[in-house]
């Protein structure tokens, strides 16, 4: 392995590791702040965490899960074997299709948020603290978050394919603020 490749590998590894560590620290601070500022005596903390489960599930599927894992090798193949215009067309079609799917899921999610809450947390139905209503309201607000986080993850996959690792590694830290 050439010294240039070793340096590039080391630089990219340190960049991604550093930004991942920063992201984890920001995530810890965020979770601590949530715990401190949302008293669980009213059940608000439980409602908050339930409302975040569904968008985070979609984030794992569309953002950081199967889609990104499948997309990077396909895009890399296009990048290495096709003309620049074909690659750009593939990227445009991919983003357009994903945007359409995420908009549909977001709109449906906003409309059926209370039903989803009662399916995931049936104990909220007769809660003395109206946790179901609070969680449903929070979930309605979180579906647009799901749209943006999933789209951001696909854009990060594109950047990774083009050997740009700093911005995709830093993005989770910004989203934890």
Name every feature range the model reports, one short phrase each.
Residues 1-177:
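Membrane-embedded alpha-helical bundles of multi-pass transporters/translocases
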């Amino acid at each position: 392995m050439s010294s240039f490749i070793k340096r590039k590998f080391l630089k990219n590894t340190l960049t991604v590791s550093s930004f991942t560590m920063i992201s984890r620290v920001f995530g810890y601070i965020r979770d601590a702040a949530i715990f401190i500022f949302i008293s669980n005596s009213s059940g608000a903390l439980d409602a908050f965490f339930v409302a975040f489960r569904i968008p985070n599930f979609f984030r794992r599927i569309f953002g950081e899960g199967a889609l990104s894992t499948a997309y990077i090798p396909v895009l890399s193949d296009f990048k290495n074997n096709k003309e620049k215009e074909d690659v750009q067309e593939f990227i445009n079609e991919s983003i357009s299709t994903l945007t359409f799917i995420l908009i549909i899921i977001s709109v449906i999610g906003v409309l059926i948020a209370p039903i989803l809450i009662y399916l995931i947390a049936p104990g909220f139905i007769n809660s003395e603290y109206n946790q179901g209503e609070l969680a449903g309201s929070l979930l309605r607000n979180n579906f647009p978050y799901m749209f943006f986080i999933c789209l951001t993850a696909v854009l990060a996959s594109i950047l990774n394919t083009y050997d740009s690792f700093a911005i995709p590694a830093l993005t989770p830290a910004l989203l934890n603020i």
